[in-house]
Amino acid sequence: MAKCNAVAGFNALNGVQLNLFTTDELKAIHYATMEVLMDPGIQVSDPEARQIFKENGCEVNEQTNVVKIPEYLVRRALQLAPSRFVLWGRDKKYNTVQEAGGKVHWTCFGTGVKMCKYQEGKYVTVDSVEQDIADIAKLCDWAENIDYFSLPVSARDIAGQGAQDVHETFTPLTNTAKHFHHIDPVGENVEYYRDIVNAYYGGDEEEARKKPIFSMLLCPTSPLELSVNACQVIIKGARFGMPVNVLSMAMSGGSSPVYLAGTLVTHNAEVLAGITLAQLTVPGAKVWYGSSTTTFDLKKGTAPVGSPELGLISASVAKLAQFYGLPAFVAGTOSDAKIPDNQAGHEKTMTCLLPALAGANTLYGAGMLELGMTFSMEQLVIDNDIIKMTKKALQGVPVNEETLAVESIQKVGIGNNFLALKQTRQLVNYPSDPMLIDRRMFGDWAAAGSKDLAAAAHEKVVDVLKNHVVKPIDADILKDMKAVVDKADKAFRGM
């Protein structure tokens, strides 16, 4: 037959793809954003950041702390920001490429304050502690569809007792060999994070810059403010060579316009202001275009993350990031359910598919429940399957000489089956194959113990925590890393 190389999907991304906007609509959002960056501008609460903006031609009001950012500076920043960078793991097999229009990746949710604990079919919620971070890191190290690790919960047992955020840096880095993304960094402590990473590299700061095993996330304050902490995380991250994620958490109808397009404008202004600051600090600094923006439920008084609007906003942000040539990090695989139940499965699938189909580079939300307040290890294991099936859907239906299978059809002929065909046997792993989601008939399922999905997930959690082995760190290096934590604790306690 005649050769063809048609591939499902279109444009730069292979497979199934969701297109939300025309180029003119993306330009309309951009130009509306440029108007907002000049009027009313961005409130920049950090004096050092205001000085950086001022030295680069921005109008700065020192009475109101408002900075007006002209379009030419934004365009220059977008030209300087890399469209591709690598997140290194302690084990390089976990290295992850973040690239505008590139492959879709997943990470766990962060940062919650409670754990949903499974107890013989019942659930209780308790405050999260440092050991939970270690356990989740180990679970994510095992989970094949979690590409890198984000801080999932707070070490609330350390709060008020020591340098909590520094513990929240050390514990993940030592309990998974995957890249660690700190979702709750403290600007004044970034030097400690740097020192922990440098200690891992034997004091070689240049190697730490070249192979970043650590990155940070910061959130502008909606609407239209960069806090002192956000600015310091951006500035220090850029100076220390750490990838920085500028992620807006606007709430449509609350801290941003009720119209989603208007919310994208304020969201865009906040993120571009942070990205511009990073590039003015260190040209070429690695940055994500981030989003955890959702709606404000005007009837319930909550900010739902399992809503169709969150999926649409995250998909929209992915398209904006591609428009600017930046990697996108967005909320997805999220749920408002309190336990791993039917609601969680429905919401996570919906909020996973929409931004994934739009080509977001990273979706974060795996393991999350209760509007982002709670983390469940059983849910993470279930989400690992949801993500695996989503990845299969993203492949679409490739059409080429091999997949059209004309020779196979002719060989099998009429009324026969393809089970014994060599091609079928060779591709036994071609169909989707979830680990826990059950595809057996009722009788076989009952004979195996009639376990529901959450019970099966709990068994897997217990097995992984008992048997999975994380790549260890050399004892002397580990000692040096821990010494940084001890130093931070002493400083916190005034010793």
Swiss-Prot record:
Keywords: Methanogenesis, Methyltransferase, Pyrrolysine, Transferase
Keyword Transferase: yes
GO molecular function terms noted in the UniProt entry: trimethylamine methyltransferase activity
Subunit structure and binding partners: Can form a complex with MttC.
Enzyme class, spelled out: transferase
GO biological process entries: methanogenesis; methylation
Pathway annotation from the record: One-carbon metabolism; methanogenesis from trimethylamine
Name of the molecule in the record: Trimethylamine methyltransferase MttB1
UniProt function note: Catalyzes the transfer of a methyl group from trimethylamine to the corrinoid cofactor of MttC.
Reactions performed catalytically: Co(I)-[trimethylamine-specific corrinoid protein] + trimethylamine + H(+) = methyl-Co(III)-[trimethylamine-specific corrinoid protein] + dimethylamine
EC nos: 2.1.1.250
Keyword Transferase appears in the UniProt entry: yes
Assigned protein family: Belongs to the trimethylamine methyltransferase family.
Region forming the signal peptide: none
